[in-house]
Amino acid sequence: MNMLPDIETLETAAEGGSHPLFADVPSSVEFNKLRKRLLRLTRQAIEDFSMVEPGQRWLVALSGGKDSYGLLALLLDLKWRGLLPVELLACNLDQGQPNFPKHILPDYLNANGIAHRIEYQDTYSVVTNKLPEGSTYCSLCSRLRRGHLYRIAREEGCSALVLGHHREDILETFFMNLFHGGRLAAMPPKLLNDEGDVMVLRPLSYCAEIDLEKFAAAMRFPIIPCDLCGSQEGLQRNAMKAMLEDIEKRMPGRKDTMIRALSNTRPSHLLDRKLFDFAALNQTLITGQDASDDI
């Protein structure tokens, strides 16, 4: 069901009023274009992947990084304009990382009148106890965080957990799976958790990381560093990021092309027998039926 207005309506709305969070943002043409583009792409992902059911409550994960701040701001802007008929609850999970500035997020959320929940769970100690010194903590830390966020979503009556992954996150995951996992899989824009009671949504799936960086700078979000624990993301993801940046530099626009390709698959032109019945082609040949598939 189409729950959101068309793009023309959205673009007209983007020129009008907005959430108080945007009260002191730049009035430049450049920023207005950036905001409009991010709103349009966020709305497009929400519509394309049927994320909205009226009356829902969404738990918006807020880490303090540029992506989650941008996600929250764009969703609040859409809701302020009457374009997102859901209730939003921001949530930060303080995982006990060393030197985590506990005051920044509550101060920011309270100052802007944003409904939120802050919860402390010392997953940092769990990770450091389980993994040898020098290991990359990000994967285990993320899994533990996700489990707590699912629990909080249930406790708060939220049917969806909303995450700030963007276009580059999806492409990097695709190539990590391709090169290191031997499978064609990316990061889904919409996923039901294993228990079947919380939907995971990624409304920024079409948004470019560089746009979110510019947006965060213009909005003056109080960014919290993601490396407080001293660990860095694995070399595999960093290598994929560097590869994609090199491709984009040499052939501008390829990232957008790759994202479009992920929604334009041809199972008959791959090698997965679970997706396409190659054996049925023998019967088709005998009966003379047309089984062509855009060769």
From Swiss-Prot:
[4Fe-4S] cluster binds at C138, C141, C229. Binds 1 [4Fe-4S] cluster per subunit. The cluster is chelated by three Cys residues, the fourth Fe has a free coordination site that may bind a sulfur atom transferred from the persulfide of IscS. Pathway: tRNA modification. Its cofactor is Mg(2+); [4Fe-4S] cluster. Transmembrane segments: none annotated. It is found in: Cytoplasm. GO terms for molecular function: 4 iron, 4 sulfur cluster binding; ATP binding; magnesium ion binding; sulfurtransferase activity; tRNA binding. One of its GO terms (cellular component) is cytoplasm. It catalyses: cytidine(32) in tRNA + S-sulfanyl-L-cysteinyl-[cysteine desulfurase] + AH2 + ATP = 2-thiocytidine(32) in tRNA + L-cysteinyl-[cysteine desulfurase] + A + AMP + diphosphate + H(+). Keywords: 4Fe-4S, ATP-binding, Cytoplasm, Iron, Iron-sulfur, Magnesium, Metal-binding, Nucleotide-binding, RNA-binding, Transferase, tRNA processing, tRNA-binding. A motif (PP-loop motif) lies at residues 63-68. Its EC number is 2.8.1.-. The thiolation reaction likely consists of two steps: a first activation step by ATP to form an adenylated intermediate of the target base of tRNA, and a second nucleophilic substitution step of the sulfur (S) atom supplied by the hydrosulfide attached to the Fe-S cluster. PANTHER family: AMINOTRAN_5 DOMAIN-CONTAINING PROTEIN, SULFURTRANSFERASE-RELATED. Catalyzes the ATP-dependent 2-thiolation of cytidine in position 32 of tRNA, to form 2-thiocytidine (s(2)C32). The sulfur atoms are provided by the cysteine/cysteine desulfurase (IscS) system. Homodimer. This is tRNA-cytidine(32) 2-sulfurtransferase. It comes from Mesorhizobium japonicum (strain LMG 29417 / CECT 9101 / MAFF 303099). The lineage of its organism: Bacteria, Pseudomonadati, Pseudomonadota, Alphaproteobacteria, Hyphomicrobiales.
